[in-house]
Swiss-Prot record:
Belongs to the small GTPase superfamily. Rab family. This is Ras-related protein RABA2d. It is found in: Endosome membrane; Golgi apparatus, trans-Golgi network membrane. Its main location: membrane. The gene is RABA2D. A lipid is attached at C214, C215 (S-geranylgeranyl cysteine). It comes from Arabidopsis thaliana. The keyword Membrane applies.
Length: 217
């Protein structure tokens, strides 16, 4: 979802949060969108999303961040959840090795359902619990490099690198969108220079933003 619309923002980017249940996706969402953290937050039931508007290279971007439970029983919503996403944060818990071991499965699912150009940031969350660490930062960095992903360790509790993670993803999405728009303009200019040619290339979806849907406890 990368809409260019005549509203109070220039672009609307849909970003999905994925990863096992309990890794801190909901607190990452609330930290980025509301600057809040809840120590007793429960697992998300179904799907919820929140938005935040910010500046990316002089453009006003509305980030629509989607969060869903990681349990297998919610896999039925996979296709709808990923549809239209242009960015993703793949989150694991640095204190739980199994959540890191499951990263490749989540990555495979993401690549199966999302656009091939989706921008992915892998986030090793709960970096504030370094004394309980079971996944070395180097392991996360190595896996990210192997898979061609960006990587940061984050702490929703201490607000460490949460802002940077989203800003990095949003900036990369914007660069991709800008390159596509420029290529389309160049192609249109080339076509207009050919007698008898008048091709219009539309690379922007101007449909309205999706309706808000939220169900959480």
């Amino acid at each position: 979802m990368a809409h260019r619309v005549e509203q109070d923002y220039d672009y609307l980017f849909k970003i999905v949060l994925i990863g096992d249940s309990g890794v801190g996706k909901t607190n990452i969402l609330s930290r980025f969108t509301r600057n809040e953290f809840c120590l007793e937050s429960k697992s998300t039931i179904g799907v919820e999303f929140a938005t935040r508007t910010l500046q990316v290279e002089g453009k006003t971007v509305k980030a629509q961040i989607w969060d869903t439970a990681g349990q297998e029983r919610y896999r039925a919503i996979t296709s709808a959840y990923y549809r239209g996403a242009v960015g993703a944060l793949l989150v694991y818990d640095i204190t739980k090795r199994q959540t890191f071991d499951n990263v490749l499965r989540w990555l495979r699912e993401l690549r199966d359902h999302a656009d091939s150009n989706i921008v992915i940031m892998m986030a090793g969350n709960k970096a504030d619990l370094n004394h309980l660490r079971s996944v070395a930062e180097e392991d996360g960095q190595t896996l990210a490099e192997t898979e061609g992903l960006s990587f940061l360790e984050t702490s929703a509790l201490e607000a460490t690198n949460v802002e940077k993670a989203f800003q990095t993803v949003l900036a990369e999405i914007y660069h991709i969108i800008s390159k596509k728009a420029l290529a389309a303009q160049e192609a249109a200019a080339a076509n207009s220079a050919i007698p008898g040619q008048g091709t219009t290339i539309n690379v922007e979806d101007t449909s309205g933003a999706g309706k808000r849907g939220c169900c959480s406890t």
